[in-house]
Amino acid sequence: GADSCSLMIIGLAPGMHGANRSGVPFVGDSSGNLLSEVLKASGLAGRVKITNAVKCLPIKNLPSSREVKNCSRFLIREIEAHQLNTSPVLLLLGGVAHRATISALGGKQSDYRFAHGAVHDMDGVTLVDSYHCSRYNTQTGRLTYQMFLDVVTAAGNMAYP
């Protein structure tokens, strides 16, 4: 992703068939394909920084609280570096990324409830929640292409007014 940008997308963790193989978040799997399509459709391709809350491949595809905590210092550094350049907007993909980011920024979970499309202000940092663009969420209909496009576009409009 872009080094100096106003929108940072924070996902869950490397996917077994995606970032775990490619070394790049959201590259090489269905989640990455959907994110790429939506970024192109919203005009945000090349204008975002993309990372994951957890840097290692989770054993059962869902990171443990220990894995999230162990990786929080890396997430904090990435967010701080992002804040140096912009008035940041963070698009949080899924509940794990949401909770990890709230914790990394020193917030209280109960003050920032996760909900798809929710927008939170946290000391000048805008947080936008989305369901994760996982194959499971898209196949079950929890997240449709249009829902994802709408939330990504909204985050982009906040980052680039």
Which residues are covered by each model-predicted region?
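A polyanion-binding, active-site-adjacent surface
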Residues: 1-114, 118-160
